[in-house]
Amino acid sequence: MKKLLLGAAFMLGAITVNAQDGPKVGQEDLSLYPNVEEYGIYPLWGWYTAMGNQSYGTIGANSRGMAITADGTKMLIPNRTDVKVDDKLVSSTIEIIVYSALTGEKEKVVKVSDDIWNHGNDDKGDPILRDNEANDIQVDAAGNVLLWRMSTNIGVSPAECWAVNLEDGSVKNILSATVEGLEGRFDYFGVYGDVVNGDGYLLSATSNGDELYGKTVLRWRYVGGVLQPQDESDQIFITAYYPSSAVSNSYGTRVCPVNEDLFYMDAFSSFATLYNMDGTIADSFASIADEATRNAIQPMSAGNNGVAEFSLGGVNYAVYSISNQLDAIQTGLRLVSLNDAMEFSSMKLVYNLPAQGMGNISNPERTVLPRVIVDEAAGIARIVIYCNRGGAVAYDFGLASVLDKLHPDRVPVGLQGNKVPTLRVTSTKGEIVLTENADIEVYDLLGRKIVEKANTTFVKVLPGLYIVKAENAGYVLNTKVVVE
């Protein structure tokens, strides 16, 4: 990890802070995230399998990507519904579901123009219809929203990329390309720079398991918003993987551009690895010499794919997928810090996100994506994570002192004013019980206040799952509790 990954972290002027009083709907137990040295993290919201509140109706096989708008306020998830007769497309509905990156609540649905899949008629008058549109989504450095068409065989079926206007759903095609002599499925893509009006490139890797076509990464370069002819350097052949037991990109491969010379690839049988544009490894977890240290930092298993890196306050970080649904942390990611050169060998664990994983999720599309929005002025990085079929979760990360000011209800864990807080929340049948007198507010999972009581050690409630805010002696505790 050599340089800041400009394609994965947006630099913002301001990040909006949630001013809602009381516990946040879907917020994790804050005690899971103690401060790490002078840094802390604040879970904004979570709607995912392990929390039991995964409520996104569109998450499924055809909602495989996620992106964040350039201003950091919106989470975008594409969705398609293809209607086929005798395995031939007859119609398609392409949508971008827009959620608040601050609260996770759905805000609107953008119906994308049918021009994205209906390309008119050919010379014989037959309709030209494309399936598999909107298989992935990205936002480039200029804030352009891009949708990707999956090619199941790029030798005969074009990979396509479309710029989408979120106001009216209109589209502009910036790529429709086949590659003669190459067979391969290209599910997802990455973007660097401004590919609509400026300079940059698109990058996509085969999701093939064979050794002949399954090691290919393709690049499409843009100058002044104009697609350039591909040359030999744009057809990249991967020469090695980590772990070395991997023999191809295989399924659901994700690529993440760093700059003109470097990109990350996270593949089905290999871990997130930094590559040169000639397909050789620039850096990997193999550079961590001590085996125990390496095992503590590298993924528990391959399979789920996603990686990003960013800098905040002069410190470099990376966040990457570490597990599948059957690992100790089920479907999780890891946030680490790095040295100035961003070398794998310098990685130090900061947090696992979510701390207990997103859950036991069947995810054949292999999507577990981190997206990061950085606001240097505020001293905050907002990390949003999306798991195909499994949900999403968001965090604010930064100096603990900054987080405490932005989120007054944040619970510092450990020593506070040279005292250790002893307030805890438990339950008995029909009651929420406090270990000492405190003011208590109880909310249901929809954020509705159920009961509020001052200076008490218990409140009576009906059986169910509740979010509890309790406060005494200046300490604030937010947690979840199940009452029988």
Report the location of each language-model feature.
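Hydrophobic h-region of N-terminal signal peptides that target proteins for export
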Residues: A9-N18
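Surface-exposed loop and turn segments in beta-propeller and other repeat-based domains
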Residues: P23-T58, E107-R130, S170-Y192, V226-N249, ...
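Signature of short aromatic-glycine-proline-rich micro-motifs recurring in repeat-based ectodomains
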Residues: Y48-I68, G120-Q138, L147-S151, V179-N208, ...
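Short coil/turn segments that connect the beta-strands within blades of beta-propeller domains
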Residues: D71-T73, A142-N144, G198-G200, N259-D261, ...
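Short glycine/acidic-enriched loop and turn motifs that connect beta-strands
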Residues: R80-V90, S151-S157, S207-Y213, S269-F271, ...
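Beta-propeller blade signature
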Residues: S91-G104, S157-G169, G214-G225, T331-L338, ...
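Loop/turn-rich, solvent-exposed surfaces of beta-rich toroidal or solenoidal domains
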Residues: S270, D290-Y351
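C-terminal outer-membrane/trafficking sorting elements
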Residues: G414-E484
